[in-house]
A protein has these predicted regions:
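A polyanion-binding, active-site-adjacent surface
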Residues: 3-232
Length: 232
């Protein structure tokens, strides 16, 4: 694989783009070493695309948000390229259009991390912070990255509702919030009330595949946000 062949020629950390990046609470360090497979994949991407972000993607949004959106992981040409969750790929188009419709955005989304877009009342994060091969993190990688999700959710003092995009995000978020999976099965539109903490709402992931196949439609996705607003 081209990524694997190039990984030994990655630029050293001090030559990477965004050398002054400093992670905030709940974000992974730029050269996080916890998952060897993801580190190797990340290094290969740095060698092939030295101007891309190619690092754990930090959360994005309002630090006083009442709504959090938990995705799966960065896409190779989306967040892994731009350094902002859901920015630069198909899933971001639907997500940010929906956030805008429901009044969560300031500025205009233009698929770039420097487009001036802001979020008001909402925050976006991922279950896994690094881009995984074939968009499929392993169970061990999901578990290893979960402490960052736990810490990120704890940094949001006004959090009332979390929307989980897809089954993996659902499972990791349930565990991050201290819930038990058998009591909280995934299903689009399912609402999960845990003993403490925010309410969790499930949604199919807003991926190109799900929208092209009709598994997720725009009205279905918007209904999830309507439910979130009703639970605020």
């Amino acid at each position: 694989m081209e990524i694997d062949a190039a990984r030994d020629h990655a630029l050293p950390p001090d030559q990477q783009p965004w050398p002054n990046y400093r992670p905030q609470p709940g974000d992974a360090p730029r050269d996080c070493p916890r998952c060897p497979r993801l580190v190797a994949f990340r290094d290969g991407a740095r060698a092939l695309h030295p101007d891309w972000w190619n690092a754990p993607v930090p959360g994005f949004g309002d630090p006083y948000a009442w709504l959090a959106i938990s995705g799966l992981a960065p896409g190779m040409q989306g967040a892994n390229r731009t350094g902002r969750p859901f920015t630069g790929d198909w899933a971001g188009l639907l997500l940010f259009d929906t956030l805008s419709k429901f009044g969560f955005t300031t500025g205009t989304y233009d698929a770039r991390s420097d487009d001036g877009l802001g979020l008001c009342g909402a925050f976006i994060t991922n279950a896994v912070r690094c881009v995984p091969p074939q968009n499929k993190p392993s169970p061990v990688e999901i578990q290893t990255c979960r402490p960052f999700l736990v810490d990120r959710l704890k940094t949001l003092p006004n959090l009332r509702v979390v929307i989980a995009l897809g089954q993996i995000a659902h499972q990791s978020t349930i565990k991050a919030l201290g819930g038990k999976l058998p009591k909280h099965p995934f299903g689009h539109g399912n609402v999960h009330r845990l003993h403490t903490g925010p309410v969790l709402i499930d949604s199919y992931h807003c991926s190109r595949y799900n929208t092209n196949t009709g598994r997720l439609t725009v009205p279905m996705f918007e209904a999830v946000f309507e439910a979130a607003l009703a639970l605020r």
